[in-house]
Amino acid sequence: MLCLLKLIVIPVILAPVGYPQGLPGLTVSSPQLRVHVGESVLMGCVVQRTEEKHVDRVDWLFSKDKDDASEYVLFYYSNLSVPTGRFQNRSHLVGDTFHNDGSLLLQDVQKADEGIYTCEIRLKNESMVMKKPVELWVLPEEPKDLRVRVGDTTQMRCSIQSTEEKRVTKVNWMFSSGSHTEEETVLSYDSNMRSGKFQSLGRFRNRVDLTGDISRNDGSIKLQTVKESDQGIYTCSIYVGKLESRKTIVLHVVQDEFQRTISPTPPTDKGQQGILNGNQLVIIVGIVCATFLLLPVLILIVKKAKWNKSSVSSMASVKSLENKEKINPEKHIYSSITTWETTERGISGESEGTYMTMNPVWPSSPKASSLVRSSVRSK
């Protein structure tokens, strides 16, 4: 039904209501916007007039280059906005057509979207066509994983690149520690709030600041004094009117800069937390194998240590004995030789003379020296 409506509406718009060949047009200079893959971009198309007039028609065209053929992104006529082709569900007319505004919001930007976007706008009861080109450059997708140490401060960026200011109406930051856990509000901003300020709630109170410039469509935040419990998934929802653009950041909190890098994937569900992953299983198997291989070596080392200890003890005993023998002084054994008186009758009545002989005895000699008795008979 929608395709049939397009076939009917497009010829009606482009033929009867199309611009005559001689219709004058006004082209302004083309601003440049740079946006990362997956983000949103707002391309302004505002007619600057002192009086406000109702927009009669808006066409947004895309071409890779100035000389390339153009394709329709979106067209607006008679209060009907129709996105076309590959831009369906991603392009939205966000300008206030009652105030000369035909701005376009393009969500989930892809690399193929890089090129020149031209807005052609005509006001009611005027023949002049206003043309405003915007050059879009698409950069690689920003990393979704952010690592920070405990106690440090980290920035989390969330913005809409735009040629116009003051288009963001609301910003919400939410936190979840897992896929099945309840979300917590980190920060909330609403342009309709009386205070016009943001609110940080719950355990993030007094630790979160809105550092982005809301007037420039920037809802970035700063998280201070990071805790281990802050690890998880942070989702930024930034609104232009009722249209929401989302950005997800996975925050990993580490103890120090030398700690092993945590896997960038968010916590899994289905009870997988209690199951070892492949890397852990390999590490455990390696430890077990190493233990079995090193056990015999350990046993040999223990036995060798005991044998060395026993040998050292024996040597110490021998040396102690030798030292003891050297320290003890020489001992002499004195023995007396008994003298017997003789009643033998001899010449001049002279009696025999008795003498005592001392021989040294060494402790190391196998046998003690015997007592030697010698008698010298008197002449």
Curated annotation (Swiss-Prot):
Disulfide bonds join 45-119, 158-236. Changing residue 122 to A: Loss of interaction with CXADR. SUPFAM superfamilies: Immunoglobulin. GO terms for molecular function: protein homodimerization activity. Keywords: Cell adhesion, Cell junction, Cell membrane, Disulfide bond, Glycoprotein, Immunity, Immunoglobulin domain, Membrane, Phosphoprotein, Repeat, Signal, Transmembrane, Transmembrane helix. Residues 24-135, 140-250 form the Ig-like V-type domain. One of its GO terms (cellular component) is plasma membrane. GO terms for biological process: gamma-delta T cell activation; heterophilic cell-cell adhesion via plasma membrane cell adhesion molecules; monocyte extravasation; positive regulation of epithelial cell proliferation involved in wound healing. The modification Phosphotyrosine is found at residue 355. It is found in: Cell membrane; Cell junction. Residues 303-379 are cytoplasmic. InterPro entries: Ig-like_dom, Ig-like_dom_sf, Ig-like_fold, Ig_sub, Ig_sub2, Ig_V-set, Myelin_P0-rel. Glycans are attached at residues 79, 89, 125. The Ig-like V-type domain 1 mediates interaction with CXADR. The Ig-like V-type domain 2 may also play a role in the interaction. Homodimer; active form in leukocyte-endothelial cell adhesion. Interacts (homodimeric form) with CXADR. Interacts (via cytoplasmic domain) with the PI3 kinase; upon CXADR-binding. Interacts with ITGA4 and ITGB1; integrin alpha-4/beta-1 may regulate leukocyte to endothelial cells adhesion by controlling JAML homodimerization. This is Junctional adhesion molecule-like. It comes from Mus musculus.
